[in-house]
Amino acid sequence: SLTAKDKALVKAFFGKIAGKADAVGHEALVRMLVVYPQTKTYFAHWPDLSPSSEEVKKHGKTIMAAVKEAVGKIDDLVGGMAQLSDLHAFKMRVDPSNFKILSHNILVTCAVHFPDDFTPEVHVSFDKFLAALSSTAADKYR
């Protein structure tokens, strides 16, 4: 579970990346689609899954908007992110293992673009946060 220190580190780190969050989301999604091509099945309705695709850019922005919302609701992720869980479980029927894959790609992208801020402490706390968010997103599957 997230400690008070974890929460403080996550909030501070997200504050540093917030201005580039859309680009982080876009790159993380591109990485996921390229490195884990099986994830493309959830986006088969898009006409273009290339890195320059408008759909991919838009969804990257959507992803990071949800992460930002979760940072704001860090003290009650399950209650605060219930709609996200409902959407992915009941409407989109996304395999919950994909949340972990996306989280990993968000971490990689943050490490690449924010090396000075992505300290080992931040890495651990942000990873724990994304794991908690992934678990929350998968909550309705249980």
Curated annotation (Swiss-Prot):
The keyword Heme applies. GO terms for biological process: hydrogen peroxide catabolic process. The modification N-acetylserine is found at residue 1. Heme b binds at residue 88. Disulfide bonds: none annotated. Residues 1-142 form the Globin domain. Coiled coil: none annotated. InterPro entries: Globin, Globin-like_sf, Globin/Proto, Hemoglobin_a-typ, Hemoglobin_oxygen_transport. GO terms for molecular function: haptoglobin binding; heme binding; metal ion binding; organic acid binding; oxygen binding; oxygen carrier activity; peroxidase activity. It comes from the Eukaryota. Pfam families: Globin. CDD domains: Hb-alpha-like. Keywords: Acetylation, Heme, Iron, Metal-binding, Oxygen transport, Transport. O2 binds at residue 59. GO terms for cellular component: blood microparticle; haptoglobin-hemoglobin complex; hemoglobin complex. Heterotetramer of two alpha chains and two beta chains. Involved in oxygen transport from gills to the various peripheral tissues. This fish has two hemoglobins: cathodic and anodic. The cathodic Hb and anodic Hb display small and large Bohr effects respectively. In addition, the cathodic Hb displays a reverse Bohr effect and appreciable phosphate effects. Belongs to the globin family. This is Hemoglobin cathodic subunit alpha.
